[in-house]
């Protein structure tokens, strides 16, 4: 025979895998728009950072960080398209929807870290306020505002759209909602615009641009440079307050928690499942949020022994699928068994007491050397060995024969009871002795309890 050579598949590097997945995404024309906006965002961010350096404005730098956040949101939208194209694999049986959650969580946390950096730099500037040049401050403000709004309203970002609606409202949204109610009380026609929950990203873009416009006017009129630092702190606080609820919501999804508003509906579904035909018990239920708008869960269902497993499984899955997109149901039948009762008459000899009781002394030999018949391996003792179980005189003692002193009829004597074999392999076998005035119909007397045969009753001669 010739030599057999094993050919292994060449493992691609990380860069090669990323290139392959990027080609998969770019095959869809819907992703071209995202890539175009991403390229424009990089160019726009470069210009804004240059203007931040020339104007020496911390407020414009804080506002530019929102443009960088837009780039993260575009990457998240691109990941969302990739997740839609990928199918579940044996390693990731639930799919790749959690990557969307991870992208949203990372983007919001990075935005909060940028806000903290702005707060730290602004605190240092309060001690020594530099001069602010307003040459390109207003131009940079409107360029950033236009691009941020155009990106948010043109690109359909499914993950961030869901998070902005599902997460709790930020303090900025609550204050704007209060002002909108007051304004709509004066002008009712604006209720259709201001009363609904405003998009938090659009709101922070408008609020940041408004703060920069106030900064520009105060510096141009009074050369009040400290207002730039105050505006930077205001934009950083608004950024942190807007991103914090989204990061909390996406973090809870990553921790596989159950949303509070779904717990009542899940309890109702489980009660309905427990009332299905053949279902005895529903236990070990666990439900969690798999992605944005999708839930997964597992449940164990105990059914009757005569129930149809496939039928019960279909009914349970149908009930749970109304709320849980990926349910996992494990069916197992009831293992309770009734004790087997003996039918028929009981033999009369079962109640007879033998002449002697043979009591086997318990063996004090360690059970470590004994084999378990189920596993064919030495079984471990269930408890610690006795304290004085080693080298004791009664370790290999033979059985003890205890006489049974039963009451006999008057006038019947006790004959001697010779033994054919005194001790035979640890069992005493008594013989039949001669009795005075006693005639029996047995040729062999049984030596174990419960082995007597009918006709062994003694007869007495008058």
Swiss-Prot record:
InterPro entries: Cation_efflux, Cation_efflux_TMD_sf, CDF_SLC30A. It is a multi-pass membrane protein. Belongs to the cation diffusion facilitator (CDF) transporter (TC 2.A.4) family. SLC30A subfamily. One of its GO terms (molecular function) is monoatomic cation transmembrane transporter activity. The chain crosses the membrane at residues 34-54, 65-85, 99-119, 135-155, 201-221, 224-244. The keyword Iron does not apply. Keywords: Golgi apparatus, Ion transport, Membrane, Transmembrane, Transmembrane helix, Transport, Zinc, Zinc transport. It comes from Xenopus laevis (African clawed frog). One of its GO terms (biological process) is zinc ion import into Golgi lumen. This is Zinc transporter 6-B. It holds the Pfam family Cation_efflux. Heterodimer with SLC30A5; form a functional zinc ion transmembrane transporter. The gene is slc30a6-b. The keyword Cell cycle does not apply. GO terms for cellular component: Golgi apparatus; trans-Golgi network membrane. Residues 1-33, 86-98, 156-200, 245-462 are cytoplasmic. Its main location: Golgi. Residues 55-64, 120-134, 222-223 are extracellular. PANTHER family: ZINC TRANSPORTER 6 (PTHR46531:SF1). Has probably no intrinsic transporter activity but together with SLC30A5 forms a functional zinc ion:proton antiporter heterodimer, mediating zinc entry into the lumen of organelles along the secretory pathway. As part of that zinc ion:proton antiporter, contributes to zinc ion homeostasis within the early secretory pathway and regulates the activation and folding of enzymes like alkaline phosphatases and enzymes involved in phosphatidylinositol glycan anchor biosynthesis.
């Amino acid at each position: 025979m010739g030599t057999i050579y094993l050919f292994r598949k060449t493992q691609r590097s990380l860069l090669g895998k990323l290139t392959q997945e990027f080609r998969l995404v770019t095959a869809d024309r819907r992703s071209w728009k995202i890539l175009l906006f991403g390229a424009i965002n990089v160019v726009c961010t470069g210009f804004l950072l240059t203007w931040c350096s020339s104007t020496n404005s911390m407020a414009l730098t804080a506002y530019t960080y929102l443009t960088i956040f837009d780039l993260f949101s575009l990457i998240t939208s691109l990941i969302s398209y990739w997740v839609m194209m990928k199918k579940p694999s044996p390693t990731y049986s639930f799919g790749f929807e959690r990557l969307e959650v991870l992208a949203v969580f990372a983007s919001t946390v990075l935005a909060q870290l940028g806000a903290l950096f702005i707060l730290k730099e602004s605190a240092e500037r309060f001690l020594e306020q530099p001069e602010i040049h307003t040459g390109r401050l207003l131009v940079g403000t409107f360029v950033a505002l236009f691009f941020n709004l155009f990106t948010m309203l043109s690109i359909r970002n499914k993950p961030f759209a869901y998070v902005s609606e599902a997460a709790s409202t930020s303090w900025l949204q609550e204050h704007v909602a209060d002002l909108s109610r007051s304004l709509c009380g004066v002008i009712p026609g604006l209720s259709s615009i201001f009363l609904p929950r405003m998009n938090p990203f659009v709101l922070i873009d408008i609020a940041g641009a408004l703060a920069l416009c106030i900064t520009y006017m105060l510096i141009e009129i009074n050369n009040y440079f400290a207002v730039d630092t105050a505006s930077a702190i205001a934009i950083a606080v608004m950024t942190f307050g807007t991103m914090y609820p989204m990061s909390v919501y996406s973090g809870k999804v990553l921790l596989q928690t159950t949303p509070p508003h779904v717990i009542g509906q899940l309890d109702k579904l489980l009660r309905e499942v427990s009332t299905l035909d053949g279902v005895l018990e529903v236990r070990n239920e666990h439900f969690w949020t798999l992605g944005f708008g999708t839930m997964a869960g597992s449940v164990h269902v105990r059914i009757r022994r005569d129930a149809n497993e496939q039928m019960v499984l279909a009914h349970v899955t149908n009930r749970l699928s109304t709320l849980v997109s990926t349910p996992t149901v494990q069916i197992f039948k009831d293992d309770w068994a009734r004790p087997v009762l003996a039918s028929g008459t009981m033999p009369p000899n079962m109640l007879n007491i033998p002449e002697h009781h043979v009591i086997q002394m318990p063996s004090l030999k360690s059970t470590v050397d004994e084999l378990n018949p189920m596993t064919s391996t030495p079984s471990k003792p269930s408890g610690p060995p006795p304290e004085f179980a080693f080298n004791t005189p009664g370790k290999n003692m033979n059985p003890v024969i205890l006489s049974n002193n039963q009451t006999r009829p008057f006038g019947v004597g006790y004959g001697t009871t010779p033994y054919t074999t005194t001790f035979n392999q640890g069992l005493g076998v008594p013989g039949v002795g001669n009795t005075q005035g006693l005639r029996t119909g047995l040729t062999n007397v049984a030596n174990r309890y419960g082995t007597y045969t009918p006709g062994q009753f003694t007869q007495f001669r008058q």
